[in-house]
Amino acid sequence: MIGDYGVSGADLAAVAALVHSWGVDFIVTTGDNNYPDGAAETIDANIGQYFHEYIYPYQGEFGNGGEVNRFFPTLGNHDWITDMAQPYLDYFTLPGNERYYDFRQGPVHFFMLSSDGREPDGIGRSSLQAAWLKQALAASTARWKLVVMHHPPFSSGYHGPQEALQWPFAAWGATAVLAGHDHVYERLIIDDVPYFVNGLGGNPVRYSFLLPLASSAVRYRAAHGAMLVEADEAQMVFEFVTVTGEVVDRFVVAGE
């Protein structure tokens, strides 16, 4: 899982090499896939150059795509800048309306949200998007249910908490909530649910922390990296690993 990564260069190349070294089944992003402004002219160099073999259908310049899609992004604020995210929507083939959607891999059900204020279906807890999520979480039979978005509901980073997105995820049945936007790594615990901020995916600008929230358990900003998430029916393991291989954080959610 990578976030705030979409800047072609050495930093992203190092993160991509780390992710490839794991031999992951698929890749999930927490947004800002294509800096600086989500343009069609930069999207393949910022994404396909590093991850084309996970994308289906892939029609870019950097090699062969996958036989099935194994790349699942979320929209970040930078992705919206050009033509209301149309280059992103054209580049990827995703489920549902493509702005927010869900998919299942093994025992894990992913719910990928559109957290920017430009989202036509809204981002507040009474929005159409929130109603979709509440219903979809309730209907899911998966062992684990992960909610992924760009803007963090809670963060001790530069942008801070995004109050509009503080939906009752725990009450609705989410196992964990993952976001980006702040170029840091943080793990917080709210209502016994882990919230992760994962924004060190390759943007050269790393943010500082502000006053830590009371719910903040782990904070890190020294180097780029990615999250490795592994799951079976018994447990989910979340790790944040730097490009040098240091495991900064490891958190386990175990079944009852």
Segments predicted by a language model, with ranges:
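A short C-terminal boundary segment appended to hydrolase-like catalytic domains
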Residues: V218-E256
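Short acidic, glycine-rich surface-loop motifs adjacent to enzyme active sites
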Residues: S140-S156
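N-terminal active-site segment of His-dependent metallophosphoesterases
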Residues: M1-N46, Q135, S155-S156
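Active-site glycine-centered loops adjacent to acidic/histidine catalytic or metal-binding residues
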Residues: D4, G31-D32, G76-N77, H150, ...
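Active-site His/acidic residue clusters
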Residues: S156-Q162
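Short, well-ordered beta-to-alpha junction loops that form the rim of enzyme active sites
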Residues: S115, M149-P152, H181, V241
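Extended active-site neighborhood of metal-dependent phosphoesterases/phosphodiesterases
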Residues: A40-W144, Q162-A176, D182-D232
